[in-house]
């Protein structure tokens, strides 16, 4: 044996086999899927461009009221005060995730864990 490779399959045979497979399956096209990580990177770019708040306002407001209830009952909040708390909370979380990502990169990891 001279180590020669097996002869390549002819393109015509390949195309004929593909059309036969489509005919067998009834021509149903499977939905398009992006490679793992592509959508994640697109979302990262999208959210880094945006400036709007990412936590829904009402659930955050309920959380603020629930926490405040432990210290004093019947507290009232100006809407701007709740928005200021939300801005601060989201800014803190963004900074935390940035630091977490730097730590993950330093440890030669890709995924961050809680």
From Swiss-Prot:
User: Coiled-coil segments, which residues?
Assistant: none
Segment Disordered: which positions? 1-31
Keywords carried by this UniProt record: Chromosome, DNA-binding, Nucleosome core, Nucleus
KW tRNA processing (keyword) present: no
Q: Where in the cell is it found?
A: Nucleus; Chromosome
Q: Which GO terms describe its molecular function?
A: DNA binding; protein heterodimerization activity; structural constituent of chromatin
Tell me where on the tree of life, at the top rank, the source sits: Eukaryota
Q: Which GO terms describe its cellular component?
A: nucleosome; nucleus
Query: What interactions and quaternary structure are annotated?
Result: The nucleosome is a histone octamer containing two molecules each of H2A, H2B, H3 and H4 assembled in one H3-H4 heterotetramer and two H2A-H2B heterodimers. The octamer wraps approximately 147 bp of DNA.
Q: Main role?
A: Core component of nucleosome. Nucleosomes wrap and compact DNA into chromatin, limiting DNA accessibility to the cellular machineries which require DNA as a template. Histones thereby play a central role in transcription regulation, DNA repair, DNA replication and chromosomal stability. DNA accessibility is regulated via a complex set of post-translational modifications of histones, also called histone code, and nucleosome remodeling.
Protein's UniProt name:
Histone H3-1
Organism this protein belongs to:
Stylonychia lemnae
